[in-house]
Amino acid sequence: MLRKKIILVVLLFLITGTLMAQEAKVTSLMSKDLKDFPGKEGLLITVEYPAGATDPIHRHNAHAFVYVLEGSIVMQLKGGKEVTLTPGQTFYEGPDDVHIVGRSANKNKPAKFLVLLIKDKGAAVLVPVK
């Protein structure tokens, strides 16, 4: 009985650790008030997907310009087609778009992309959608 409990605890630990390792890493590179657009700011970030990482369904309430730096990613907006992007390719999300698929295209290799957001000053970068 004790052996089964130990195995269960180890498996739970491994599964939890694996799930936690699958989260995207977001790094803010620059934020700038846009004086010609009162109340707006530009935010430049990088997003790194570990191998197999996926995003929750969300929106940005912003204009989001995506540029793939490394690896490949899969993106899809509600009502749109799923697209696979490789280094040098771009993607756009509008303020009203719901992002239903965002993930690394390769379960064994990470991916990295640059995102320029034009958004309301102080607004959240990502808003979960149910």
Q: Which role does the model predict for each range below?
A:
Residues 34-38, 48-50, 79-96:
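Short acidic-glycine-tyrosine-enriched beta hairpin
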Residues 39-44, 63, 80, 96, ...:
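Extracytoplasmic
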